[in-house]
Structures are given as C-alpha cells and as structure tokens.
From Swiss-Prot:
One of its GO terms (cellular component) is plasma membrane. Its main location: membrane. The chain crosses the membrane at residues 20-40, 49-69, 83-100, 104-121, 140-160, 167-187, 207-227, 248-268, 289-309, 357-377. Belongs to the major facilitator superfamily. This is Uncharacterized MFS-type transporter YhjO. CDD domains: MFS_MdtH_MDR_like. GO terms for molecular function: transmembrane transporter activity. Keywords: Cell membrane, Membrane, Transmembrane, Transmembrane helix, Transport. The gene is yhjO. Pfam families: MFS_1. It is a multi-pass membrane protein. It is found in: Cell membrane.
Length: 401
C-alpha cells in the first residue's frame, strides 16, 4: 500500500492528487442526490411535472450566460481563486436545499449552484492541463472520471436509503463534503496559471480563434441532450416502463458507475493511438445505440446493456475530447476554451428538460430517445468528416504561436 502511495505521488502532481481526493468525496455525496432530485422536486411541488423541469432548467440556462464570464475569471484571477469560490458557493446552495420549501427558493439555490459549477469546471480542467504533461493528460482525465464513477457506484444506493428516510440528509451530506473539499483546497491547492503567458493580442481579440471549439460545441449538443433527458424525463418515463422504478433507477446508476470505474482507464489507454476521427466515430455510434436502448429497455438486462454501451462511448469520447481541447487552446485562453466548450452541457440542460417534458406529456418517452438516436448519428458523421481539418490545420497553427 505504501508503495502504491509513493507511485501515485511521483506520477501525479499535487493539484492532480487533490482533485482525485475532492472528486471521490463530492461524487459520493452528489450521487446520493442525482437520481432523486427530480423526484424530490416532483413531490415537494404537489406532483407537478413541468415545474420541476422549469426549476432544473434554470441552473444551466443561467450557466449559459455565466460560463463565458467564468472562463474569463479563471484566466485572469487564477485557477485557485475560481475553484475556492466555486466550492463555497456550491456548499452554500446545498445547505439552502435543507431548509427550502417554496419553488422560488429552489430556483434561486439551483442558480447559485450553477454559478459555482460554471466557475469550477473550466478552472479545474485548465489546472489539470497546466500541471500535467501532454502525454499524460488523457490518463489523468480518465482517472478523474473513474474516481467520480467510484463515488457514483455507492452513492445511489445510500441515496435511496436516505431518500426513503429523510431526503434533506442527502443535501446536508453534500454540503458538508463540498465544504471539507473547500477547506483542504484552501490549505493545499497551489496556483498553476502561468505568471507571464505569451499573449498575442491579435489572437486574443479575434473571434476566429474560437471557431474550432464552437464547432465541437455544436456537434456535441446531441450527447449532452441525451444526458439531460436521462437525468430528468427518463426518471418519469421509467415509471411507465418498470413497476419498481426507484430500484431500477438505483441499480442502473450504480451499474453504470461501476462500468465506468472498471472500464474508463483501460479504454482511454487502449485508444490513445487511435485518430480522433476513429475515436469520435466509435463514440457517436455507442451514444446512438444507447439512446435507442433507453427508448425500448423494458427489463433490467436491456437497461444494463444500455448502460454498458453508453459507458464505452463516454469513456472513449469525452476524455479524449478534453485532451484535444487542451491542444487546441492557446495557453492564455485555456480557461475560456474549456468554458466555451462546456456551454453545450448548459444549453442542453436548460432547454432539454422543458422540451423533453413537453414531448413526454404529448407523445411519450420513446419519441424523445429515438429522435436523439438519429441526431447522434447525424452529428457523429458530421464531426468525423470535419475533425481531420482541426487536427492537421488548427492545432498546427496554434502550436506555432
């Protein structure tokens, strides 16, 4: 065990090791809440379907406007300041959920949590890219995702027990975990932002430098839209698919996390030498099959197969895309590039629940997921066609600056 600790210490930098710890702590408590948030709001707001969807849409809708500012903040003030502020805001929001009773209070707290996420995600990803050699970035992102999945494995099971006992305990534990992470980061987290980056003013001011990452954003929307639906409307759609839907959701969440924990690093390491074109082709095929799987899964076996296929897609694709963006971005715009790309999650999670709720009530859940399967195939073909231009022209141009 001591040998393993020294191996981790020598292989990964201090910011990376701290991120490992924080990811494990917060993923466990966050996973207790994730599968049940929609159901909790659904019950608290007298069985309404659209009101929970509206509240959940507010956070990512606000994030759309906040994320670009957050990327600029992390590039100007530094990664450490942005991360500490983010953790404090998220801890305060989760504490508020313990006492919230009215719809407008839930909405305010959801937006506050979104501000924290908008700051944390680009800052933490930029810090990983700055403190890790390029040859090891995909590995580090994969390990972080695997650690996150480790927390997700146990989180839903504990969350179901707490939800049946008293749901507010879930929020209290999440708030405590975020605050502990904040305290340790305040003591141990170094600043990794370059003190004197080689800034090219013309490059910074030009909108054209963002075109490649905007293209990635656009063609990643179907992926994030699939996640938006599995996190919201699928929770309600599953009521019609399974008699014991709470147990099925819990088993699905735990199984998917376990698949990710086991498969994440081997899949990333095994595909490092593949071209981005091949990686993205595999990724979008897997996501398209998973979307169709959600539409037709009527048994636990089918649902677990869907989870496994989706895990392969996200393990291969999402991790390599993070590394790809770190190569794409000029050093002085790294935080903003991660922020811009991350907008696709906010866009999907702002319009997805509302659009999905309307389709669910009008046409049924199958229509949502079959339509997403078609969109994913189309986006995947488009991205595999254009990705070679980004690899051979844009990255070469940026690296010469």
């Amino acid at each position: 065990m001591l040998t393993s600790f020294h191996s981790i210490k020598s292989r990964y930098t201090a910011p990376v090791r701290l991120r490992f710890f924080g990811e494990l702590l917060t993923s466990l408590t966050g996973a207790m809440m994730g599968p049940f948030m929609v159901l909790y709001l659904h019950e608290q707001l007298n069985g309404s379907i659209m009101m929970p969807m509206l509240i959940i849409s507010l956070q990512p809708f606000a994030d759309i406007f906040l994320t670009l500012a957050a990327g600029r903040v992390t590039d100007r003030l530094g990664r450490r300041t942005a991360i500490l502020t983010a953790l404090l805001l998220q801890s305060a929001a989760m504490t508020g959920f313990v006492f919230a009773e009215h719809a407008y209070v839930f909405a305010i707290l959801y937006v506050m949590n979104g501000i924290g996420r908008s700051l944390y995600i680009p800052a933490s990803r930029a810090q990983i890219a700055e403190s890790t050699p390029e040859s090891r970035r995909s590995e580090v992102f994969a390990v972080i995702n695997a650690i996150y999945s480790t927390g997700l494995t146990a989180g839903p099971l504990v969350g179901m027990l707490l939800y049946n006992h008293n749901p507010v305990w879930i929020f209290a534990l999440d708030a405590a975990a975020l605050f502990i992470y904040f305290l340790i980061a305040a003591l141990k987290l170094p600043e990794t932002k370059p003190l004197h980056p080689a800034v090219t003013p013309k490059m910074s001011a030009s909108f054209t430098i963002y075109r490649p990452v905007l293209l990635l954003l656009l063609l990643s929307l179907p992926i994030s839209m699939l996640y938006a639906q599995t996190e919201t409307t699928y929770r309600l759609f599953s009521k019609n698919m399974f008699s014991d839907y709470l147990s099925m959701l819990t088993i699905y969440s735990a199984a998917k996390a376990l698949f990710s924990c086991v498969l994440q690093v081997p899949l990333v390491k095994g595909t490092e030498k593949l071209s981005m074109k091949t990686i993205l082709f595999i990724t979008y095929i897997c996501y398209s099959l998973a979307a169709a799987g959600f539409a037709c899964s009527t048994s636990l076996t089918m649902l677990l197969v869907t989870a496994a296929v989706m895990t392969v897609g996200e393990s291969i694709g999402l991790t390599h895309i993070q590394t790809f963006i770190s190569k794409l971005a000029p050093p002085h715009l790294l935080g903003r590039f991660y922020a811009v790309y991350g907008l696709h999650w906010d866009i999907s999670r702002s319009i997805g629940p509302l659009a999905g709720g309307l389709i669910l009530t009008s046409f049924g859940g199958e229509v949502i997921f079959y339509a997403l399967a078609v969109c994913l195939l189309t986006a995947g073909l488009s991205l595999t066609y254009t990705i070679e231009k980004l690899e051979h022209k844009v990255i070469r141009k940026v690296n010469r600056l």
